[in-house]
Design a protein with these regions (language model features):
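Functional transmembrane alpha-helices
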Residues: 2, 87-95, 202-300, 312-338, ...
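Residue-level signature of transmembrane alpha-helical entry/exit and packing/kink sites
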Residues: 3, 7-11, 95-104, 111, ...
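Active-site His/Glu-centered metal-binding helix of metallohydrolases
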Residues: 24-29, 109, 113, 304, ...
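Membrane-embedded helix-turn/re-entrant segments that form the catalytic/gating core
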Residues: 31-115, 220, 226-229, 234
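Aromatic-capped interface at the extracytoplasmic side
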Residues: 32, 118-134, 356-359
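Alpha-helical transmembrane signal-anchor/signal-peptide segments
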Residues: 33-38, 127-145, 150
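Conserved PDZ fold ligand-binding element
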Residues: 144-166, 242, 335
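PDZ-domain C-terminal substructure recognizer with occasional recognition of PDZ-binding tails
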Residues: 150, 156-157, 171-212
Length: 360
């Protein structure tokens, strides 16, 4: 019972919200362009419950790992019965290619918009925690020790630029190897200006690659300060966090193809369920930014140019836009079979990784 309440239920709720907004994007833009939507389903497979409202049947299906919007004329084979003129006007295929691209792209972009809204909401509620720019430890024989820094010094400016958080120190120092920096510190009730020359060091980035960076040999005290944000401040913080996660997600995909990031690091539904459950037990509020990160990952994944994903369909439509006619049904089916194989293979790999982690 505890496993269901703490792991399975939060996972289903979070995934359900993400899938709903993804499919809502397709649905709303399709309706805006006058396309008849036959089905709106959360989940795949057999129908659990459903209700017809207007021209659309709304469903909850048995497999909760996805969803779909079925539009009139979408995916029809060449032997399908022709539509009446009235129905043809409402079909997906009758719309201009750019409108169809907008309908397909709306799902992933709604996931990105959801992430932006979710991050903004989180910062409105929780504010931010910043690391106080206070020195907790100084490395022996380091530039900082030679320059006269002491434990407990609070860095308030570097080269005349005000410092309000520990992260700003790293930003100022890492690209300044060999360049003298004037750093103003608060020591007791006095202000002192010390000159330090960062030394070049080779470290690892988050992908395990060697990177050169400037270091002065100081460690943060670890003291945190809670800062409440105004609505405008929360919106600004939410925007930059969304953009930061989008960039990191895209870079991670590139590094995967470059084999810099090992494929064994990929996680799937089991890992997401574990993380969702752990966060739900620790603090339900933490589920908000976690959901935003997963929403961005879902959006970027669906934009990959793989047949069967939204990105693959966008590629088909771009080809149609260039050559003036759609690919044949047979060509699309072959491409989609390849895409399905790739997707099933990926799912098998991430589930294998998840199970391996559990056994370890």
């Amino acid at each position: 019972m505890n496993i269901f309440l703490y792991y399975i239920l939060p996972f289903i709720v979070v995934l359900g919200i993400l899938i709903f907004f993804h499919e809502l994007g397709h649905f709303l833009v399709a309706k805006y362009f006058g396309v008849k939507v036959l089905k709106f389903s959360l989940g795949f497979g057999s129908k659990l419950v459903g209700r017809q409202i207007g021209e659309t049947e709304y469903l909850i299906s048995v497999i909760p790992l996805g969803g779909y919007v079925k539009m009139l004329g979408e995916g029809e084979n060449e032997d399908a019965e022709p539509l009446s003129p009235e129905e043809e006007e409402k079909s997906f295929t009758s719309k201009h290619t750019l409108k169809r691209i907008a309908i397909v792209a709306a799902g992933p972009f709604f996931n990105l918009f959801l992430a932006l809204f979710t991050f903004c909401l989180f910062y409105m509620i929780a504010g931010i925690q910043i690391g106080v720019p206070e020195i907790g430890q100084i490395t022996a024989n380091s530039p900082a020790q030679e320059a006269g820094f002491l434990e407990g010094d609070v860095i308030i400016a570097i080269e005349g630029k005000s410092i309000g958080a520990w992260s700003e120190i790293k930003d100022a120092v890492q690209y300044s190897s060999g360049i003298p920096l004037e750093i103003t510190v608060k020591r007791g009730g006095s202000l002192l200006t010390l000159t330090v020359i960062p030394e070049e060091s080779v470290g690892k980035n988050i992908f395990g690659e060697d990177v050169k960076t400037g270091l002065i040999g100081i460690v943060a005290s670890g003291r945190l300060q809670a800062v409440a944000l105004s609505p405008l401040g929360a919106a600004k913080e939410g925007f930059w966090k969304t953009w930061e996660v989008i960039k990191l997600t895209c870079l991670t995909v590139i590094k995967l193809f470059q084999r810099v990031v090992p494929i064994k690091t990929l996680g799937g539904p089991i890992l997401i369920s574990q993380m969702t459950g752990q966060l739900a037990q620790e603090n339900l509020l933490y589920l908000i930014p976690f959901m935003a990160v997963i929403s961005i990952n879902l959006g970027i994944l669906n934009l990959l140019p793989v047949p069967i994903l939204d990105g693959g369909l966008i590629i088909f439509l771009l080809i149609e836009l260039v050559i003036g006619k759609p690919l044949s049904i047979k060509q699309q089916e072959i491409a989609q079979k390849i895409g399905l194989f790739l997707l099933v293979t990926l799912m098998a790999v991430v589930i294998f990784n998840d199970v391996t982690r559990l056994l370890e």
